Amino acid sequence: PVIAAVHGVCFGGGLQIASGADIRVIDPTARMAVMELKWGLVPDMGGYALWKGLVRDDVLRELTYTNREFSGTDAKDLGFATYVDPNPVARAMAIAADIANRNPTAQRAAARLSNR
């Protein structure tokens, strides 16, 4: 599994990359936004396809069209975050340690089911 720990600014491609993780731990003060349209681009690195499974369609459209910035706390409510934690790296490492103690064959099988 891939775990993302996000703090600071996570705009555009950074948000797309973080969204590809299996588990996303976000600092509550992180600044996040779908910024591509502001720059004359479209979120075409796979982010939009991922977001459609995480975020309500009307909300995703609004975030994409307006480039509205949101916090890490908002990210949880919107569906972008699995957890919100003031120390995302420590939380991500704790989750990784827990996962590492599980059966790797079962982990791979679960990942295959999730990725269908």
Task: Go through each PLM region and give its residues.
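Helix-turn-helix DNA-binding module
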Residues: G13, K76-L78
